[in-house]
Structures are given as C-alpha cells and as structure tokens.
From Swiss-Prot:
EC number: 3.6.5.3
Keyword tRNA processing: no
This protein's UniProt keywords: Cytoplasm, Elongation factor, GTP-binding, Hydrolase, Magnesium, Metal-binding, Nucleotide-binding, Protein biosynthesis
Record-stated family: Belongs to the TRAFAC class translation factor GTPase superfamily. Classic translation factor GTPase family. EF-Tu/EF-1A subfamily.
Keyword Cytoplasm included in the entry's annotation: yes
Region feature (G2): 60-64
Location of the tr-type G domain: 10-214
Record protein name field: Elongation factor Tu
Region (G5): 174-176
Gene that specifies this protein: tuf
Domain of life: Bacteria
C-alpha cells in the first residue's frame, strides 16, 4: 500500500500515556500504532522501538521520551510515552511534551498503585485538561465483579483530584492480546478480533472525549521581549518570538512586567528585514513601538494583548529538583533559599518560602531528585499565569524545573 501524503487537513491533538510502572503504557502505545496501521492510519511501531526512547533536553534537563504519531478517522495525534517514572515527572513539569489529554493506563489485575495516584496529581497540577482511562490486562481477570471494583476505585481516585471521575470514559482490554493478534494477522479490520476492537474503542473515546485544543494563533497575543534596539528616526524595536496569538500593525498592546504596565501602539512588524502586516505565533519578529524609549523596555518584559496577562510576584508551583548526576545540586535546600527563576527570557531572583509534600504536610527541606510543591516570592513582578513553565537556576546552572499551579498575588 503506497503511503499517503501527510495532509494537515485533520485537527492536531497531543496526547500521552500515563500510569504506574509495568501497567502497560508502552505496550498500549505499540498496540495503538499497530491497530491503526492495520487501517492505514499509522506507521506500526514495535514495543522495543518505543521503549528505547531517545534522550532530549528541555530547559537544561535530560529526559527520555518516545514520540509516535498516528491518525484516526477524525484527527492527527502526536503521542508521547516515557520509559521511566522519573522521565514522566520531568516531562510533565517542563512541558517538554505538552499534553492536551492523557490516556491513564491501569492494570485491571492490580488496580490503582502509587504512581497511578502520582500521575493523576501531576496531570492536575501541570494542567493536563482531560483523561481517558484504559483498564489493561483484562485477560488476567476472570471475575467481572473485580473489574467493576477496579473501575470504581479509579473513578474515585480521579474524583479525589478534581477530575470528573463519574464522566470519564473507561475502556477495558488487553494491549498485549491485541498486539499478539495484530502480529499474527496479515490484515485486520474492525470486527475481526475482540481485543483489537477494544483498542479501536479506546481511540473512539479519545476522539470523542478529548476536545480539540485552541490553536496557538487563536489565543491572545503574547511575545516575551528578548532584545531592544533604537532605530534613529523610527523609534524603539523590541524583538522576540511570538508565543501565541497574532499582532497587526496599528494594534494597541501592553508592556507587562518588572515596571508598571503601560500601553503602546505597534507601528511596524518586521521579520528577516522584511515588513509584514501581521506577525503570528511562532514568528521571530521585531515590533516597532510608538512613544516608548529604549530604556523603558528590558528583556523579561512581555508585550501582550491588553488585559490578557498581569504581573505577579507570588505563586505556588509544582517543581522537580535535579539529582546530582543530572547536573543538579549536591546538597538539600531549606525554606528561605534564594535562587533565580528563569521565566520565558529572563532570570528573576525569588525566595522559596514553603514546601508542601503530596499529602499536604509541610516538608522541612528538599533533596536533589525530589518533586515538591513550593511557594515562591519574586523580587520583581513579572507576567505570570497558571500553567507557565520556568527553570530554577543557581549561577547560570539549572537545578530544577517547575510549573505555576496557582497564583497567590
């Protein structure tokens, strides 16, 4: 069968598999690609291909992540799977693989386990908006009542972390049985094999339940300032990469962060020495600003659609602290620790005032390799919003990564 040309006609969604070690995340990922490949909608990927995930660096942190892509009738998916638990934690906190939704894999034979809980909590903290559940290893459970019991447990657990546990689709099946059927068959269509059909059913639920995300260009405009120039006779130009939205010549934008928020008008948009009518998400541009002096702007400020983002100094965050062998600190740190927080394009000094463990208790100190919730107070207000990522640095070296889970003031 000739491989069809990849047309970007379908909406694109990023998803990932999450759940406890050995509950079958990678096997399921392989089963999804194999079953959709049988319909000509994916390239089949074997378990070993996915498990040998390449190393990536994101915000100074090394993470192993496997990326696969496939299509359903309605959508194109990019799917991320991590081999180790630590990779999941780092991946979700750094946002290396942004997820619009996740497939939570729970072994029907074991029920929810500690990492099941931890991944659900992480999904909540880092803003993964939707979860669909796959109850795996159904072939190992003869008792229908036991299946129902595990399903109830999973729904309760999701409710505990403010996901709509009663409404979330749960599909049971066996990724391994599906893979074996697919490996042994020359061709496969819906209705040929009950185990493969359960994988198709899962993808139908993912299609229906996980909404298509708003595209970056449709969000309110935001560009973090990287550099500032003064052009004689023309004015001040701020350069940077547009993070989201679009900006049109003549539009009013706000300059937010470090100092008082002020408005200015964009009188020109330039890219690669050419003038444009508008810049959009992903473009590296220079914006010519009316009535602003070069000294009024500095790196670390953002230009944004008026009213869309505000400056803050205090927030709660979910953080991963690097281990010594990852290039992190060698020693623990305590409340009162003052590192730099690298947000978008700049370092801002801040004080860490409190640590909270998963169970809500206060932690006395943080060790390299820990994941912890911490309260941070910055010395300068900067444009912050929930779900925003940052790195924690000490003398230019990354010692941790975090995501804003709640703005305090």
């Amino acid at each position: 069968m000739a491989r069809a040309k990849f047309e970007r006609t379908k909406p694109h969604v990023n998803i990932g598999t999450i759940g406890h070690v050995d509950h079958g995340k990678t096997t399921l990922t392989a089963a999804i690609t194999m079953s959709l490949a049988a319909l000509g909608q994916a390239k089949a990927r074997k378990y070993d291909d996915i498990d040998a995930a390449p190393e990536e660096r994101e915000r100074g942190i090394t993470i192993n992540t496997a990326h696969v892509e496939y299509e359903t009738q309605d959508r194109h998916y990019a799917h991320v799977d991590c081999p180790g638990h630590a990779d999941y934690v780092k991946n979700m906190i750094t946002g290396a693989a942004q997820m619009d939704g996740a497939v939570l894999v729970v072994s029907a034979a074991d029920g929810p386990m500690p990492q099941t809980r931890e991944h659900i909590l992480l999904a909540k903290q880092v803003g993964v908006p939707n979860i669909v559940v796959f109850m795996n290893k159904q072939d190992q459970v003869d008792d229908e009542e036991l299946l129902e019991l595990v399903e109830l447990e999973v729904r309760e657990l999701l409710n505990d972390y403010d996901f709509p546990g009663d409404d979330i689709p749960i599909v049971s099946g066996s990724a391994l049985m599906a893979l074996e059927a697919l490996n042994g068959a020359d061709s496969m269509k819906k209705g040929d094999n009950e185990w493969v059909d359960k994988i198709y059913k899962l993808m139908e639920e993912v299609d229906a339940y996980i909404p298509t995300p708003e595209r970056d260009v449709d969000k309110p405009f935001l560009m973090a300032v990287e550099d500032v120039f003064s052009i004689t006779g023309r004015g001040t130009v701020a350069t940077g990469r547009i993070e989201r939205g679009k900006v049109v010549v003549g539009e009013t934008v706000e300059l937010v962060g470090i100092r008082d928020t002020r408005s200015t008008t964009v009188t020109g948009v330039e890219m690669f020495q050419k003038t444009l009518d508008e810049g959009m998400a992903g473009d590296n541009v220079g914006l010519l600003l009316r009535g602003v002096q070069k000294e009024d702007i500095e790196r670390g400020m953002v230009l944004a659609k008026p009213g869309s983002i505000t400056p803050h100094t205090q927030f709660e965050s979910e953080v991963y602290i690097l281990k010594k062998d990852e290039g992190g600190r060698h020693t623990p740190f305590f409340p009162g620790y003052r590192p730099q927080f690298y947000v978008r394009t700049t370092d801002v000094t801040g004080t860490i005032s409190a640590f909270t463990a998963d169970d809500g208790s206060a932690a006395e100190m943080v060790m390299p390799g820990d994941r912890i919730k911490m309260t941070v107070e910055l010395i300068n207000p900067i444009a912050i919003e929930q779900g925003m990522r940052f790195a924690i640095r000490e003398g230019g070296r990354t010692v941790g990564a975090g995501v804003v889970s709640k703005i305090l003031k």
